[in-house]
């Protein structure tokens, strides 16, 4: 492990963000709070927003330090982030094609009528994926991989562990079928490799952010526009 960045209570808290989010999300379903779409979406947003704030606040030193370095060669680094997003997306979409799945758009209903009860949940749902990279990159790419970069065999083991856990963390996106999570695991390994190569968390974070924006946020905006334009 990097001797200059010793493990602290903050790292422990960051590791528990995702398990807490998944547990609370499951409790919402058990308690029947997901029956109301608007209420469920707002509650899920609050859960993810809390996780986002926790990760950003507790890892602000890492994020601030790496962002200063990122800005020094912004166009080069952003270009690498775009390339990373393409590779990340290519692995995921290639895997979906291989397994003949279409989770990226299967839950989008372009025929739903426009109303406050439908547009608001859709809008909120489009924002949530933009917060996810901040938590997932600090957890899977930094805490569970990059911290261990100076220990050869542990580094390799943590690359596998972090990538597998990254894929499993998205089980809800793939109908809880493990084989369908394999492309996400490989995509996570690709982001870890990008982070290791350049030594800057923002390169992988922006790559993840760009992918989520392209396949979640912008389709959501398009859906809202179509519904509102339809005047229904």
Positions of predicted regions on the chain:
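N-terminal juxtamembrane cytosolic/stromal segments of multi-pass membrane proteins
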Residues: 1-9, 62-66, 176-177
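Alpha-helical transmembrane segments in multi-pass membrane proteins
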Residues: 5-61
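Residue-level signature of transmembrane alpha-helical entry/exit and packing/kink sites
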Residues: 10-14, 40-44, 73-81, 120-125, ...
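Alpha-helical transmembrane segments of multipass membrane proteins
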Residues: 20-25, 47-52, 84-92, 166, ...
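Juxtamembrane/transmembrane-helix interface segments of polytopic membrane transporters
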Residues: 22-29, 96, 100, 216-227
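Juxtamembrane helix-loop-helix connectors linking adjacent transmembrane helices
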Residues: 33-35, 64-132, 224-231
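Non-cytosolic membrane-interface motifs at loop->transmembrane helix junctions
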Residues: 35-43, 107-114, 177-189
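Transmembrane helix-loop-helix hairpins at the membrane interface
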Residues: 121-232
């Amino acid at each position: 492990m990097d001797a200059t960045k010793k493990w602290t209570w903050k790292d422990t808290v960051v590791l528990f963000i995702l398990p807490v989010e998944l547990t609370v999300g499951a409790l919402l379903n058990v308690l029947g709070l997901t029956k109301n779409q608007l209420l469920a979406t707002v509650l899920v947003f609050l859960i993810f927003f809390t996780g986002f704030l926790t990760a950003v606040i507790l890892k602000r030193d890492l994020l601030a330090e790496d962002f200063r370095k990122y800005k020094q060669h912004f166009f080069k680094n952003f270009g690498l982030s775009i390339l990373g997003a393409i590779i990340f997306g290519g692995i995921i979409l290639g895997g979906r094609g291989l397994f003949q799945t279409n989770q990226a758009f299967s839950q989008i209903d372009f025929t739903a009528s426009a109303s406050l009860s439908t547009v608001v949940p859709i809008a909120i749902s489009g924002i949530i994926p933009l917060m996810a990279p901040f938590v997932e990159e600090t957890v899977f790419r930094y805490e569970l991989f990059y911290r261990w970069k100076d220990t050869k065999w542990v580094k390799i083991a943590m690359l596998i562990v972090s990538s597998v856990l990254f894929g499993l963390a998205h089980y809800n996106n793939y109908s809880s079928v493990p084989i369908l999570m394999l492309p996400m695991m490989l995509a996570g390994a690709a982001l870890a490799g990008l982070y290791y190569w350049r030594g800057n968390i923002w390169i992988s974070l922006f790559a993840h952010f760009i992918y989520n924006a392209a396949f979640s946020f912008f389709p959501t905006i398009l859906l809202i526009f179509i519904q509102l334009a339809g005047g229904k």
